[in-house]
Each structure stands twice: as C-alpha cells, then as structure tokens.
A protein has these predicted regions:
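Nucleotide and nucleotide-moiety/phosphate-recognizing core
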Residues: 1-110, 120-134, 141-147, 154, ...
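Hydrophobic alpha-helical segments within soluble ligand-binding/sensing domains
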Residues: 114-118
Length: 192
C-alpha cells in the first residue's frame, strides 16, 4: 500500500435524529452503508464531524459525517482533509440530488455545486471544484411551488428508500473504482 494513498469519503447530511431518513440525509445513509460493509466504525469526533478509518482494497480510507449541518459541510471536510494531507481529488463526497429520480446515481470527477449548498460549502473551503462526488437521486419536488426545504427535509416514502438502499452495492463498487483511479469506468457502469 502506498503511504500517500489515502482517501476521505464524506457523506453529507444534518446531524440531529429528527433528520434521520430525510431526503437531504441520503449522503449520511450511504456513508453508513459503506462503513457497515467495510467494517469501519464512524464514532470518533474531530473537526466537527464523526469519523473512522480503515483500509479498503489497499487504500487507506477516512470516512466522515460532518456534524456542521449541510450548509457548512466544508467546515468539517476541509480541516479533516488538511489534517490527513489528503488532496482535493482524493475527497469523495456522497450527497443527495433532487434532479435525479430516487436511487439514480450520478458520478462526476468535479463540477459546480449545482444549487447544492453542502457542495458549495466544500468548494469554498477546499478552494475549487476538483473533487469527485457521487450524487444520489432523491427525486424532484412534486410541483414547482412546493417548498424546497420542506421537500429535502421530508422523509422518504418506503418505495423511494428501497430504491436508494438497493443501489448501495453499486455505490460501494463505484467508490472502490474511483479510489482505484477508474472513475470513468465507475461512470459507465453505475451512472443511472
């Protein structure tokens, strides 16, 4: 294992129990699924986040759930990346995406925040857009006048929650490919 081969995988969400199972916490739930699959305990606290570390396919991995609330996610992610000397292109972010149907994955090597305040905070704190992300479809608002905050902070109906959890094996495989330097392959296999 290369000593410099370390990845930070951050799942975005809001920390209070009342947000468990909400659309905006799809990133937290996905990170929990990875932690469970990889047998990494995410229970230590540092830089306003819950974190744990382990090894996956020969890569050192730090898993992080920022406890800053969504809109300040970068305030936890940037210091954690700095502490472990992890470059931005080795920071993989898992977050919700209202432009995609529930369970659809959108893997990107970089890009704008696309209206996502958690991504905006990370871009601001890391100083650029050059970090990979897996966006998890949570479904669009039922109509344009529906309040966005009410939608993303609402709970998933069971069928949408299942559509997302059914994709966790694909998300895990995609994360491994990304760490292996095969993001393009992850996109072709798992986008959609």
């Amino acid at each position: 294992m290369n000593e410099n081969d370390i990845w930070l995988i951050a799942g975005l969400g809001n920390p209070e129990a009342k947000y468990d199972g909400t659309r905006h916490n799809a990133g937290f739930a996905a990170l929990d699924a990875l932690a469970d699959k990889w047998n990494i305990s995410v229970g230590k606290t540092k830089f306003q986040g819950l974190w744990g570390q382990g090894e996956v396919n020969g890569h050192k991995v730090v898993l992080l759930k920022p406890l800053t609330y969504m809109n300040l996610s970068g305030d936890s992610i940037a210091p954690m990346a700095g502490f472990f000397k992890i470059p931005a292109d080795h920071v993989l972010v898992l977050c919700d995406d209202i432009t995609q149907t529930p369970g659809k994955l959108r893997i990107r090597p970089s890009g704008s925040a696309g209206g996502h305040n958690g991504l905006k905070s990370i871009i601001d704190r890391l100083g650029g857009e050059n970090f990979p992300r897996i966006r998890i479809g949570i479904g669009a608002k039922p109509h344009p006048d529906y309040d966005l905050a009410a939608w993303v902070l609402g709970k998933f109906p069971p069928e949408d929650a299942k559509a997302i959890s059914d994709r966790y094996p694909d998300l895990e495989a995609a994360a491994k490919l990304i760490m292996d330097g095969k993001l393009g392959l992850a996109q072709s296999k798992y986008n959609g």
